[in-house]
Amino acid sequence: MKKSRKKENMDSKERNQKEAERSEARNSESPAEKAGETKVSPENEPSSPEAEKNPEEACREENEILKDQLFRLAADFDNFRKRTARQMEENRKSVLEQVLLDFVEVTDNFDRAIKSARTAEDMGPIVSGIEQLSKQFFSILEKYGLERVKCEKAGEFDPHRHEAIHHIETSEVPDNTIVEIYKEGYALNEKVVRPALVSVARSPEEAEK
């Protein structure tokens, strides 16, 4: 009888000890483990819509963006070209208008001179008036950059400014001397636009070669 009670006491102690161990094990678990939660790794996280895009689709979208930018640049350049062309044409017309208005003044003076010449008995004033008109006319040309090419009789022939239309054999003057001037030459802003037409001396010895 005593042995039976002793055995029951030992079994009770063992049960209490095991129960205490199980209780201690439960208390040492983390809240996440108690709730049965599992930690999600970065690899298992759901990806964003941007990250899920197909590389080919992303490349196609970028290509469309670049194409749109190119079309916009082309349109801007075309508008700039047309605007510049219009502005240049307006400037050309404005300059031409001013030039023509300047020459209209000379035309008015020519008309007055012609009327006076028809009834004048003394041509002296008429000649003087025409000379003044010539000066007025050329002053307008100079205003826009036109000037006479330097060319004088007995001067030296310059192939860059003069054009020899005749050669006169003579030993009285050196070779390449200007003998006669047929037409004046003109330069616009220092560029020869029409050479002076002249005759040039050439020695008989040079002509025989």
From Swiss-Prot:
Give the highest taxon in the source lineage.
Answer: Archaea
Subunit and interaction comment: Homodimer.
Entry keyword Chaperone? yes
Q: What does its record list under induction? A: By heat shock.
Query: HAMAP family annotated for this entry?
Result: GrpE
Q: Which InterPro entries match?
A: GrpE, GrpE_coiled_coil, GrpE_head
User: A single GO molecular function, which one?
Assistant: protein homodimerization activity
GO BP terms: namely: protein folding
Annotated region (Disordered) at 1-63
Gene3D superfamilies in the cross-refs: 3.90.20.20, Head domain of nucleotide exchange factor GrpE
**Basic and acidic residues bias: start-end ranges:** 7-42, 50-63
Subcellular localization: Cytoplasm
What's in the keyword line of the UniProt record? Chaperone, Cytoplasm, Stress response
Gene Ontology CC terms, in alphabetical order: cytoplasm
Q: What is this protein called?
A: Protein GrpE
Concerning its family, UniProt says: Belongs to the GrpE family.
Q: What is its main location?
A: cytoplasm
Give the function comment from the record.
Participates actively in the response to hyperosmotic and heat shock by preventing the aggregation of stress-denatured proteins, in association with DnaK and GrpE. It is the nucleotide exchange factor for DnaK and may function as a thermosensor. Unfolded proteins bind initially to DnaJ; upon interaction with the DnaJ-bound protein, DnaK hydrolyzes its bound ATP, resulting in the formation of a stable complex. GrpE releases ADP from DnaK; ATP binding to DnaK triggers the release of the substrate protein, thus completing the reaction cycle.
